[in-house]
């Protein structure tokens, strides 16, 4: 008999979940589809942080190439001046 009485009392968490489930059923298919697509786009979109890191890496590479050529050309020019 104790089991019968215990099953009639529901936890507040279970009642809350049941209410949320009812609210979810009230949504129409286009709303649910839009919500799902928005969540997928948020998960799969590249972050601004990733884009900034790529741009910084490219700029550092270009700076390194520029510095390499600048140093090589400046030493060649110095040698030409010394030979005169």
Curated annotation (Swiss-Prot):
Where is this gene product found?
Endoplasmic reticulum membrane
Membrane topology of this protein: Single-pass membrane protein
Entry's transmembrane regions: 51-71
What Gene Ontology cellular-component terms does the record carry? endoplasmic reticulum membrane
- Tell me which Pfam families the record gives: TRIQK
Entry keyword Membrane: yes
Record keywords, A-Z: Endoplasmic reticulum, Membrane, Transmembrane, Transmembrane helix
The main place the protein resides is: endoplasmic reticulum
Family assignment?
A: Belongs to the TRIQK family.
According to its UniProt entry, the function of this protein is described as: May play a role in cell growth and maintenance of cell morphology.
Protein name according to UniProt: Triple QxxK/R motif-containing protein
- Native organism: Danio rerio (Zebrafish)
Gene for this protein? triqk
